[in-house]
Amino acid sequence: RTPLTLICAPLKRIINQESDKQDVEKLLVPIYKQAYQMKSIIDMVLDVRKLEEGKDMLHILPHPLNEWVRSVGDKFINEFHVKGIRLEYELDEQIKEVPFDQNKCEFVLSNFLMNALKFSESGTTTTLITTLSQEKDWVRISVRDEGMGLNMVDTDSLFSSFYQGGHEKGGSGIGLSYAKSLITHHKGRVGASNAAGKGAIFYFELPLFTDTCGQLE
């Protein structure tokens, strides 16, 4: 309801009063942003439904994981720099190629990075980490920040639809739920916990071996 309110209220002001071009532009820019956010939320809900109904397929192919993780993280360097947050990498060199859908997993990793950016302060560090399991059959991709941590949230509900936690910086409550759905369809796992000392860790795990590469229901 919040995005709709932020769209309808300024539109009503535009309709009810004569405004010059500059005033109209100031009102229309946030309207566009909220409309775009609503479109993104609707797209995520529809994509989850398609996955659940088997109408959307994952395009799973082997990719060099560490190289991919760094390429996704590098897209956020400017945003972290503007906020005064360091972005670092701890990549397990044992990990080579891993089968996954690049586009779907990029959404998941980007969502975790946006959360770190949102809840971290200037002067802190966010770290992208890859880890190979002891059995060498799973890899874990983690985002560790030095933000406010997870004391204000129910970690059991964190990846549930529309859950927003007990903090003031709420979102749509869809992103993490969508991320979980994408990783579950990879036959993987997602999770989150408080980091040692300060901050939070969000992670997802992918199996190193799948029945087939290419398309996986």
Language model region names:
Residues 33-38:
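Short alpha-helical segment of the dimerization/phosphotransfer core of two-component systems
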Residues 49-60:
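Helix-loop junction within the histidine kinase core
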Residues 59-64, 81, 86-96:
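Conserved catalytic submotifs in the C-terminal HATPase_c
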Residues 116-117:
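Short helix-loop "hinge" at the ATP-lid/N-box region of the Bergerat-fold HATPase_c
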Residues 150-162:
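Short conserved segment of the HATPase_c
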Residues 175, 179:
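Short alpha-helical Gxxx[C/S/T] motif in the catalytic ATP-binding
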